């Protein structure tokens, strides 16, 4: 097996371009899903046990944000102003709608209280248009656990990226 130093410049350039193609394809697929679902994050991972038994930690959720009307009982993913981790919880109450902005109150299935303590300071409900990323339309159990492992053990990220890079560069066509 030849190493990187033994490769011809043209062959090395082809492998680097192949690696760039893989990365750009993944990025384009993400952006395509974002546009189709009208959500900046069309796929999210459940990070806590607050939605058990409906969703477990590590479940991969698919979001859809095309419908502006959200019903009580629907599971939504929302962002809190000033925090960058999305929260997955169920709508327990809704206010307004029609000509007035739709406001939502959410709660985790495994939590005792609603989410008013989680919302931004001075906020007692979610604005459907501004805060909600999307509604959950499907999920794959435990597939997202890799994301949790990578965030809890950052060194795994470097190992994984290094292995992927070496595999692409050493791949023969």
Swiss-Prot record:
It catalyses: Cleavage of hydrophobic, N-terminal signal or leader sequences from secreted and periplasmic proteins. Residues 37-173 are lumenal. The active site is at 50 (charge relay system), 89 (charge relay system), 115 (charge relay system). One of its GO terms (cellular component) is signal peptidase complex. Its main location: endoplasmic reticulum. The chain crosses the membrane at residues 16-36. Residues 1-15 are cytoplasmic. It is an enzyme of class 3 (hydrolase). Keywords: Endoplasmic reticulum, Hydrolase, Membrane, Protease, Signal-anchor, Transmembrane, Transmembrane helix. It is a single-pass type II membrane protein. GO terms for molecular function: serine-type endopeptidase activity. Its EC number is 3.4.21.89. Residues 159-170 are annotated as: C-terminal short (CTS) helix. Catalytic component of the signal peptidase complex (SPC) which catalyzes the cleavage of N-terminal signal sequences from nascent proteins as they are translocated into the lumen of the endoplasmic reticulum. Specifically cleaves N-terminal signal peptides that contain a hydrophobic alpha-helix (h-region) shorter than 18-20 amino acids. The C-terminal short (CTS) helix is essential for catalytic activity. It may be accommodated as a transmembrane helix in the thinned membrane environment of the complex, similarly to the signal peptide in the complex substrates. Component of the signal peptidase complex (SPC) composed of a catalytic subunit SEC11 and three accessory subunits SPC1, SPC2 and SPC3. The complex induces a local thinning of the ER membrane which is used to measure the length of the signal peptide (SP) h-region of protein substrates. This ensures the selectivity of the complex towards h-regions shorter than 18-20 amino acids. SPC associates with the translocon complex. Belongs to the peptidase S26B family. This is Signal peptidase complex catalytic subunit sec11.
